[in-house]
């Protein structure tokens, strides 16, 4: 397997954070509401992994190193895993598995609907991130996986609605996301490989 060391690093890094958070919860180091803290951290982790996934193509074009693309799918699947854990933690720690409360939560907190839409789109990408789906869907596969841009928008909107007035951290992620989208514009994406030959760019 090519770039096995990079794949292993991604695996260990993505696995380490939830393990560390669970350990912190075990020793009561997550504050007065550890359940909510876990929900928040898993959601933020999913957003960070989504941004990392989107960064792989521009990095490959800029550096010419194929290793970035080698872990793109892996990062995307970890993003889905974190989102699934985020949703599961919400159901357990916030809802308390009281499904009757879900309707009330949806009416009081519309950002949950936004988050669910993003999760459904992410689920579609996760189950089609394999060679069989690529062959089966053909040209439709690329169109389907453009949902990643919608997912990013929904994720940022979901986070914005949650943080409300505390916009400093959200702005950072929004700027990174917008920058990654700009790098995918055809007029800019075509120029990225040319930068490799310029002085100061390796």
From Swiss-Prot:
Keywords of the record = Cell inner membrane, Cell membrane, Electron transport, Flavoprotein, FMN, Heme, Iron, Membrane, Metal-binding, Transmembrane, Transmembrane helix, Transport
Cofactor list: FMN; heme b
Topological relation to the membrane, as annotated:
Multi-pass membrane protein
A Pfam family of the record is Ferric_reduct
Q: Name one GO biological process term.
A: protein repair
* Residues spanning the membrane: 8-28, 42-62, 75-95, 110-130, 147-167, 169-189
Compartments where found: Cell inner membrane
Q: How is the cofactor bound?
A: Binds 1 FMN per subunit. Binds 1 heme b (iron(II)-protoporphyrin IX) group per subunit.
Spell out the HAMAP family in the cross-references.
MsrQ
Function description: Part of the MsrPQ system that repairs oxidized periplasmic proteins containing methionine sulfoxide residues (Met-O), using respiratory chain electrons. Thus protects these proteins from oxidative-stress damage caused by reactive species of oxygen and chlorine generated by the host defense mechanisms. MsrPQ is essential for the maintenance of envelope integrity under bleach stress, rescuing a wide series of structurally unrelated periplasmic proteins from methionine oxidation.
Q: Please give the family membership noted in the entry.
A: Belongs to the MsrQ family.
How this chain assembles, per its entry, is: Heterodimer of a catalytic subunit (MsrP) and a heme-binding subunit (MsrQ).
Name of this protein: Protein-methionine-sulfoxide reductase heme-binding subunit MsrQ
Give the organism the record lists. Pseudomonas paraeruginosa (strain DSM 24068 / PA7) (Pseudomonas aeruginosa (strain PA7))
Q: What is the lineage of its organism?
A: Bacteria, Pseudomonadati, Pseudomonadota, Gammaproteobacteria, Pseudomonadales
């Amino acid at each position: 397997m090519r770039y096995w060391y990079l794949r292993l690093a991604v695996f260990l890094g993505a696995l380490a954070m939830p393990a560390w958070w669970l350990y912190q919860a075990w020793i009561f180091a997550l504050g007065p509401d550890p359940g909510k803290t876990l929900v928040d951290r898993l959601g933020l982790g999913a957003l960070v992994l989504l941004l990392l996934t989107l960064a792989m193509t521009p990095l490959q074009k800029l550096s010419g190193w194929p290793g970035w693309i080698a872990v793109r799918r892996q990062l995307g699947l970890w993003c889905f895993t974190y989102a699934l854990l985020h949703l599961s933690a919400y159901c357990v720690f916030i809802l308390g598995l009281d499904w009757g409360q879900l309707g009330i939560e949806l009416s009081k907190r519309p950002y949950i609907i936004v988050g669910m839409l993003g999760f459904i789109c992410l689920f579609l990408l996760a189950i089609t991130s394999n060679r069989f789906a690529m062959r089966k869907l053909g040209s439709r596969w690329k169109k389907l996986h453009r949902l990643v841009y919608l997912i990013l928008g929904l994720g940022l909107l979901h986070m914005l609605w949650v943080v409300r007035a505390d916009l400093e951290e959200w702005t950072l992620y929004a700027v990174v996301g917008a920058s990654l989208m700009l790098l995918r514009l055809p007029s800019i994406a075509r120029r990225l490989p040319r930068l490799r030959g310029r002085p100061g760019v390796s």
